C-alpha cells in the first residue's frame, strides 16, 4: 500500500467522507499564506471533507438555525481531531506535517484563514468552485465542511473536477444579501469579488451571528439552495 493510499484509508476510517491531495506549487507561486512562508517546508496538502446532516440543512430558510450553528461547530471539532490524527500518522513516517483547523480566522478584517480550504479542496478534486465560492461535490453538493493538512510527504495529487454549475442560479436567487453575482467560470475565480459582493456576504453573516443561538459568522442559505446537495444524496450522513 503506497503512502497516498495509507493516508486516504486512515482519513476515511476516521470520519472523512471525502479526501484528496493537492500539489502546493500553485499556492506557493501565488505567495499567499498566513503567516507568510507557512507553505515553504511542504510539497502537498491533504483536503478532508465531512458531509453535513441533510435534515439540518433542509430546515434552513432565509437565515441559519441554532441547530445548524451547533452542527457547524461539532463537525469542525471532528475535522480538527481527524487532521491531528493525520499529522500524527505522517510524523510516524518521519515526514513533516501541519494541520490547518477547519474554522480559524487569521485576518479578521478580510475573514481569511492560513490558507483557503476551498482552494485546496478544488485542486484536490473534492469538488468544483461554485458561483457561491463554495466547493460543490457531485454527491454532497456544498453540504460539506473542510480541513487541510500540509505535508512534505511525497503523495500523488488528484485532478480537479470540471465545473458543472452551468446556467443554474439557485444560490444567487436564494442569497439573503444578494451577494452572489451569478458569474460562470470553467475553472475558478480570480478573487472573491469576481463572484461575490463580498461586503454584502460579510455584513449579513455578522448580522446573523447576533441571532439567538447562532454566535458565529455563518449563513447556510446557499448551502441549502444548491440542487446538487438536494438531488444527489438520499438520506443523511451518519450522525457525529
Give the residues covered by each predicted segment.
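Non-catalytic, usually N-terminal nucleic-acid engagement modules in DNA/RNA processing proteins
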Residues: 1-73
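Catalytic cores of enzyme domains
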Residues: 30, 68-240
Amino acid at each position: 500500500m503506497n503512502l497516498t493510499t495509507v493516508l486516504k484509508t486512515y482519513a476515511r476510517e476516521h470520519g472523512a467522507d471525502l479526501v484528496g491531495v493537492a500539489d502546493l506549487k500553485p499556492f506557493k507561486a501565488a505567495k499567499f499564506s498566513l503567516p507568510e512562508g507557512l507553505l515553504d517546508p511542504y510539497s502537498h496538502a491533504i483536503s478532508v471533507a465531512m458531509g453535513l446532516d441533510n435534515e439540518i440543512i433542509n430546515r434552513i430558510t432565509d437565515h441559519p438555525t441554532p441547530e445548524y450553528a451547533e452542527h457547524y461547530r461539532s463537525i469542525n471539532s471532528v475535522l480538527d481531531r481527524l487532521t491531528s490524527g493525520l499529522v500524527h500518522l505522517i510524523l510516524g513516517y518521519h515526514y513533516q506535517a501541519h494541520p490547518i483547523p477547519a474554522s480559524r480566522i487569521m485576518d479578521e478584517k478580510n475573514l481569511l484563514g492560513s490558507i483557503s480550504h476551498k482552494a485546496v479542496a478544488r485542486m484536490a478534486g473534492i469538488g468544483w468552485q461554485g458561483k457561491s465560492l463554495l466547493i460543490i461535490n457531485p454527491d454532497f453538493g456544498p453540504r460539506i465542511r473542510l480541513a487541510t493538512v500540509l505535508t512534505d510527504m511525497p503523495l500523488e495529487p488528484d485532478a480537479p473536477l470540471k465545473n458543472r454549475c452551468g446556467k443554474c442560479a439557485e444560490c444567487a436567487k436564494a442569497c439573503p444579501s444578494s451577494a452572489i453575482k451569478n458569474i460562470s467560470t470553467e475553472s475558478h475565480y480570480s478573487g472573491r469579488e469576481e463572484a461575490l459582493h463580498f461586503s454584502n456576504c460579510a455584513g449579513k453573516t455578522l448580522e446573523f451571528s447576533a441571532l439567538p443561538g447562532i454566535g458565529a459568522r455563518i449563513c447556510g442559505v446557499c448551502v441549502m439552495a444548491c440542487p446538487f446537495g438536494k438531488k444527489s444524496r438520499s438520506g443523511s450522513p451518519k450522525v457525529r
